Amino acid sequence: MKALSIPDVLAEVAVLVRPHFGKGKPADYIPQLATVPGGKFGMAVRMVDGDEHVIGDADEGFSVQSITKVFALGLALNRLGDEIWTRVGKEPSGTPFNHLSLLEAEQGVPRNPFINAGALAVTDVLMDVTRDPAALVRDFGGFLCGERLEIDPAVATSELAHAWQNRAIASLMRAKGTITHDPEAVVAAYCRQCALSMSCRQLARAFLPLAAGGFSPIAQETVFPERLTRRLNALLLTCGIYDSVGSFAYRVGLPAKSGVGGGIVAVVPGKATVAVWSPELDRFGTSVVGTAALEAFSQITNCSVL
């Protein structure tokens, strides 16, 4: 990563992404997300040495959605270790994040923990240790960013009311024995988890352990073993952006996780985390402007790991 002025880099990125506004649209299958203005844009960079830089709407909270899957997986791995991989795989899916056909063909075992089926399996695991896995994920995210976080009840209600595909996924996995709890309870917990609200600044802080070998500069303690940190980053690089992960790796070259709320968090191992938010999505469910911003940031700073 080049030693550049990060504020200058962010200012340049903000100019470079302007032509990309209007090329996507906010998620409309969760009605509450469809109400967010498409022109929003925020970006935050947090260095492992403590420097922090933001631009635009970086302090505005938004629905982080699937980005919470990283927190949930970290919790499950810290509690179960490699046993989690008996319930979910580690391979890219090559199919949409809420697809059923591959899950049925592979006997109810999800390809990876970042598609919806995999995240539901992780939620089922967390239900073995807590009655409220969404609150556990919320509190873990708050611990990592050093602030109290909230689940948006309006988003949670909207999401659960339209979660028919996730109900089908959970029911299939229950029939195959991948999950052990009531499918409706698993889906309800998962929808609440996804309704967590965070800002770009908070996300950049929360993901710092993945850039710092498992150590959280915010909490001032080791959150993940270094070996686990490497493995989480490997999963983010290969599975974090759904079925456009190859294109994202080609353009950006960083481990990252996206969410249909328009957020993306990327990790520059040993250096920094970068969080970006813009609600207009491409056909894969990833922020159009966010991807362009991370591509520009990666090229300007030469921070790609590839």
From Swiss-Prot:
GO terms for molecular function: glutaminase activity. The keyword Hydrolase applies. GO terms for biological process: glutamate biosynthetic process; glutamine catabolic process. PANTHER family: GLUTAMINASE (PTHR12544:SF29). Belongs to the glutaminase family. Homotetramer. This is Glutaminase. It comes from Caulobacter vibrioides (strain NA1000 / CB15N) (Caulobacter crescentus). The lineage of its organism: Bacteria, Pseudomonadati, Pseudomonadota, Alphaproteobacteria, Caulobacterales. The gene is glsA.
